[in-house]
Amino acid sequence: MKLWGGRFSKATDGLVDDFHSSISFDQRLAEQDITGSIAHATMLGEQGIIPQEDADKIVEGLRGILADVKAGKVHWMVDAEDIHMNVEALLTERIGEAGKRLHTGRSRNDQVALDCRMYAKLACKETQEMLRELLSVLLDIAQDNLHTIMPGYTHLQKAQPITLAHHMMAYFQMFRRDLDRFAHAYDAADVMPLGSGALAGTTYPLNRERVAELLGFSRISMNSLDGVSDRDFLLEYLSAASICMMHLSRFCEELILWNTNEFRFVEMDDAFATGSSIMPQKKNPDVAELIRGKTGRVYGDLMGLLTTMKGLPLAYNKDMQADKEAFFDARDTLVKGLTVFTAMLRTVTFRKDVMEKGASGGFTNATDCADYLVKRGVPFRDAHAVVGRLVAHCLNENKALLDLSLDELKQFHPAFEADVFDDLSMLSCVEKRRIPGAPAPDMVQAAIDEGRKSLEENA
């Protein structure tokens, strides 16, 4: 008989058992479920709600089960439905009647909310550690490439010269924001819901603050209906995971492009590439492509849970069983993606000579040419028009701006002088941009130093 079967006259249909059971995936919450039960039983004993002797037996029994779970010695039962009923049934089997007192003052509704919050906190911390590692790699690459000039792009067309360091620090800022988002997701999960009961609290004198203290929560939930029905904390994790995967995907897209023969900016390490079953010459950036592809999967997890939650009346509904599969899948996908991406990025070879050569094409110094005129008194819109005509002339003559003679330049505007050639070099174009956030090496160095300090202070 089910632990809840007293009201029923017959057993559930086998099809229902199979459809209803969640142990196939919520067994992942075993450690959280047992740890939460240990805290609950400890409090029940301290409050005199159950005999202290029984509380001690329960705690000892649960610790034994936890040890067996970690050792892989426990086999879960599908007909026990979920991790909560499995643990309780196993406990009662091991310690007898005392085990039946564990669920005093508790419902599976607040129990599963507790388990999910504990796991979400763990997942947030884990993800933050992985992001810190990736951020450190980005800082190292940036530090080594302060003077590696490359083209910056808009609309996937060469726009202005920047440095590889500046480009890497753009991704540093993205992943740094991800770090903050997971900190917010952690805070959202850091609420202890036990004591909410099924939906209306309990008549027992539970010490909820004591349970929160034992489990490392900063605060307790303040409404029992919300305590059992809130899944915002999972949505916040999924949202942060989706944005983080989007950043990984953008980075992967650039590496895929840069790895092509058309760009040749990078060489992917053999250990992070694959071949073709028919074309012997191929070396494919499959790792980056797969991360890009799996991003949609995490988006789907977020949208799936949002859709599940959007029509649910208060308080708990069985629909919410679906939250865990979406959460676990997103967590696993993100963790694998961050792990392999960071390892791959460490091995990427940046072809500095190709990047620097690429920066000199596409009139990337045209804006600096206009700025040259502006600094000599020409209104910006007039300077813009002059340089536009210069570019058109160069295209017709198959020349770059620096290929023109001073006499040719003066035909377009008399403000051009001999110093224009130094002013339009790729190095000069980068070094002149000396405001915070710009690509001049000393500005990027300041950003790197600030980034390292931030990582150290928030480790």
Language-model regions, residue ranges each:
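A helix-coil-helix interface module used to build multimeric assemblies
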Residues: 1-201, 206-213, 274-275, 286, ...
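A short linear-motif detector with a strong N-terminal bias
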Residues: 23, 80-82, 92-93, 236, ...
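Short runs of predominantly hydrophobic/aromatic residues within well-ordered alpha helices
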Residues: 37, 84, 88, 234-237, ...
